[in-house]
């Protein structure tokens, strides 16, 4: 989710890794492993992957069934990591993208999902050293919701807009492109209950395509979604970052982590209920499985519908990152686009495929 947050305390960073997690030897609930230790790699590759030690993976937000969160959870539950001789520990992230990036840069975690390329660029601009190795959605996940009576965004002038602490930069750009005078829109911070919109407390509400609209639809409420991409605003979702030193020393392990994740992604497309049950097992209490199945299916559609022709699932390309970086410069989010050769690893995911077929097992 494109939150573009940059501040986090050292205490919060340390506290994250004290939360409950799934350790490398504790498979989760809905899925049953079908392989065996090392069954998908050579003995030499198995030894190399084991030499990488435990890989700590931090989710983007708790155990939500989002792209780049549900698939690693399922990869572990299905035994795919074990098939590749990888020991993976899953930690729930808080949703603070800066926190995830700092954990990875420090080597406290080796891999993490992060909201999108924009969040990577903001963190790198703030001196956080990470590498982006994969990306799933080539579209912003943010949306702006209104009642159906709003037929033109300029109608929002003189009304109240609810946001979660900051107006997402993609939403701001959309409104400006539509000619909205933001000085004429009152912005208020609201919580995560989207019914504030249908109850008339706000006249527009920021959210995520895979979350608040689903909640409102389940309550029988009809809203209009205004999406940044319809106004030419670039964006992305579900980017995977890794620690640079770990990537240099254990590139094969990073490749195989992503290989298992991509295999699990395809599995979850056909077995959403089972994969969400794996996430629910990790969450343990208060997990809305029906809603999370919808989250996964919505994000999967966004990922598949936005996949550029000629690219494979998970591929991150430098040109798209540059386009997003140029946009962030124009919006005043970063001073300049960093040297992308030191940020993006565009060849890693394509190397896992033979044409459009994921290579499994590893030769």
PLM regions and their residue ranges:
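Conserved C-terminal helix/tail region of periplasmic/extracytoplasmic solute-binding proteins
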Residues: 321-363
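Pocket-lining segment of extracytoplasmic ligand-binding domains
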Residues: 192-288
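Bacterial signal peptide processing site
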Residues: 22-25
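C-terminal motif of bacterial Sec signal peptides marking the signal peptidase cleavage site
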Residues: 17-20
């Amino acid at each position: 989710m494109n939150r573009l947050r940059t501040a986090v305390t050292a205490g919060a960073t340390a506290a994250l890794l004290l939360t409950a997690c799934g350790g490398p030897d504790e498979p989760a609930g809905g899925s049953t492993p079908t392989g065996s230790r090392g069954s998908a790699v050579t003995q030499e590759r198995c030894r190399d992957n084991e030499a990488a030690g435990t890989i700590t993976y931090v989710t983007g937000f708790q155990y939500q069934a989002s792209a780049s969160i549900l698939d690693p959870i399922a990869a572990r539950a299905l035994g795919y990591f074990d098939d590749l001789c990888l020991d993976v520990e899953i930690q729930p992230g808080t949703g603070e993208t800066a926190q995830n990036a700092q954990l990875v840069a420090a080597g406290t975690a080796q891999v993490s999902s992060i909201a999108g390329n924009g969040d990577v660029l903001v963190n790198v601009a703030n001196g956080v050293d990470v590498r982006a190795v994969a990306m799933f959605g080539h579209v912003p996940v943010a949306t702006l919701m209104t009642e159906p009576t709003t037929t033109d965004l300029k109608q929002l002038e003189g009304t109240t807009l609810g946001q979660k602490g900051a107006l997402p930069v993609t939403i701001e750009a959309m409104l400006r492109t539509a000619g909205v005078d933001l000085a004429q829109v009152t912005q208020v911070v609201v919580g995560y209950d989207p019914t504030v919109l249908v109850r008339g407390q706000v006249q527009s509400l920021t959210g995520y395509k895979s979350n608040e609209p689903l909640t409102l639809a389940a309550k029988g409420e009809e809203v209009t979604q205004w999406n940044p991409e319809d106004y030419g605003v670039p964006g992305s979702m579900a980017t995977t970052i890794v620690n640079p030193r770990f990537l240099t020393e254990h590139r094969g392990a990073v490749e195989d982590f992503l290989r298992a994740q991509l295999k699990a992604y395809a599995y979850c497309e056909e077995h959403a209920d089972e994969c969400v049950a794996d996430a629910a097992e990790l969450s343990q209490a208060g997990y809305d499985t029906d809603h999370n199945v919808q989250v996964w299916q919505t994000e999967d559609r966004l990922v598949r519908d936005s996949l550029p022709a000629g690219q494979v699932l998970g591929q991150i390309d430098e040109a798209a990152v540059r386009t997003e970086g140029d946009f962030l410069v124009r919006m005043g989010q970063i001073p300049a686009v960093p040297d992308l050769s030191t940020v993006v690893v565009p060849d890693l995911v394509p190397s896992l495929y033979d044409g459009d077929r994921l290579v499994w097992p590893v030769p």
